[in-house]
């Protein structure tokens, strides 16, 4: 938004960049944001959740969204992929490519991102149980295209605990599942410094029927569990915590939501 230097309300009243006293945006403890100019200076990534049919179908959709002005990609996978099953598995009948894109193999992932410069676009992948496998495929595609893994920018949802609590798309028991999460955190911390290895998600918990307070409580508890698991695996919290992201719901009870955030 470099071209827009002055902001006004619909009534023409100028809007200042910062109001009130106390900690300022971009300064410790960052309760008002991590960037000094916030979204006036650093506009958020515009990405539409997309995925359907075959990898080729979704690749065409990705390109259409980027041509329309999207600045990032957000990948929706079908139910068999989310559950770690191949499209020809008998339990996949009726679900292949229905609620997202079907990705069974590395060749599918190559087709999914064909002719897209992964060094210039950030990619969000909404995947949990098989997140480590899909990340490995993504890295392989990028490196085949000449992009170093250290240059990749994006996010894995990779929040398996909320699956037991809300969405129910889990594959393994909790302890080995959290081990997989911490393994991904360790890999990205060492190899992919621009990658967010977990999107700790309250959204699904709220949609499953929780209150705002419960959404916040479960999400923070899950986040603490991931931090402890990574520390127990030998990682230093300051090395990985800055790359942890969060995904919350926003309901219509204005003041309650302000209090939550």
Indicate where each model-derived feature is located.
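Catalytic alpha/beta active-site cores
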Residues: 1-257
């Amino acid at each position: 938004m470099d071209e827009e230097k002055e902001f006004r309300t619909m009534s023409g009243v100028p809007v200042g960049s910062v109001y009130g006293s106390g900690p300022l945006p971009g300064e410790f403890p960052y309760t008002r944001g991590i960037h000094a100019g916030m979204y006036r200076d650093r506009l958020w990534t515009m990405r539409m959740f997309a995925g359907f049919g075959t990898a080729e179908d979704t690749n065409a959709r990705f390109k259409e969204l980027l041509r329309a002005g999207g600045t990032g990609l957000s990948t929706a996978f079908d139910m068999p992929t989310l559950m770690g099953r191949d499209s020809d598995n008998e339990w996949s009948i009726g679900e292949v490519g229905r609620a997202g894109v079907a990705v069974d193999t590395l060749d599918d992932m190559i087709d999914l991102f064909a002719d897209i410069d992964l060094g210039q676009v950030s990619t969000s992948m909404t995947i949990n149980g098989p997140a480590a496998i899909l990340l490995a495929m993504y890295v392989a595609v990028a490196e085949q295209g000449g992009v170093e893994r250290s240059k990749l920018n994006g996010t894995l949802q990779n929040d398996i605990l909320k699956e037991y609590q809300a969405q129910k798309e889990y594959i393994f028991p909790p302890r080995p599942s959290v081990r997989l999460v911490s393994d991904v955190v360790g890999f990205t911390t060492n190899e992919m410094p621009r990658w967010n290895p977990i999107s700790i998600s309250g959204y699904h918990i709220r949609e499953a029927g929780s209150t705002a307070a419960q959404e916040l409580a479960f999400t923070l508890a899950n986040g603490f569990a991931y931090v402890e698991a990574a520390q127990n695996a030998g990682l230093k919290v300051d090395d990985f915590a800055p790359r942890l992201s969060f995904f919350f719901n926003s309901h219509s009870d204005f003041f309650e939501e302000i209090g939550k955030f």
